[in-house]
A protein has these predicted regions:
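Membrane-embedded alpha-helical bundles of polytopic integral membrane proteins
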Residues: 2-185
Length: 185
């Protein structure tokens, strides 16, 4: 089915989305249920690196450019810190990484005006949103009933995302965030 012919209210890539989603959910559930904390930590590392790279790419489209190497180091250190020392290590690493970005932007960059430092806000938001929140999966895994809690969290995320997708396709009229996703309603 071509992009122009809309004979159904769902998109032409629904099959691809369903297949890739089922594979990802299967890997996630098996990893959470049967994997060690280190294995889950490795998966979290991959997800955080990919997520932070996607966040960086979205910022690049808005003319906010981040140092690629520093961004990858930030993702790596934030992801492995729960394996090294739990929540304390994760929080300490967030402070160190955020402090490093602040120092870099305020001292070592050539930005002269306060308006030029808006990228720092986006960096700190991304570090917290992606880099700090996802490694908590590793910490939750070690809690009593942690595997069950993470599986339930995964089910809630999949259901809300799916319902939002189908609701947007069925009832959506007004475009939302066209700069990020031109067809999102």
């Amino acid at each position: 089915m071509s992009e122009e012919s809309q004979t159904t209210w769902w998109s032409s890539n629904l099959t691809q989305r369903l297949l890739s989603g089922m594979v990802m959910v299967l890997v996630a559930i098996l990893s959470l249920a049967y994997g060690t904390t280190q294995w889950v930590g490795l998966l979290v590392l991959v997800v955080v690196i990919l997520g932070m790279q996607e966040y960086r790419a979205m910022l690049s489209q808005q003319k906010v450019h981040l140092n690629r190497r520093g961004w990858l180091y930030s993702a790596f250190f934030l992801s492995i810190s729960p394996l090294l020392g739990g929540i304390g290590a994760l929080n300490a690493m967030l402070i160190l990484v955020a402090g490093g970005w602040i120092l870099n932007e305020m001292v070592f960059s050539r930005k002269q005006q306060l308006e030029e430092l808006h990228s720092l806000g986006w960096v700190l938001f991304g570090l917290f949103w992606v880099g700090w929140s996802f490694p908590h999966i590793t910490l939750i895994k070690d809690l009593p009933y942690g595997e069950l809690n993470l599986c339930l969290l995964l089910v809630v995320i999949v259901l809300t995302d799916s319902l939002a997708y189908f609701g947007g396709r069925k009832f959506g009229i007004t475009p939302l965030a066209t700069g990020i996703s031109p067809k999102k309603t």
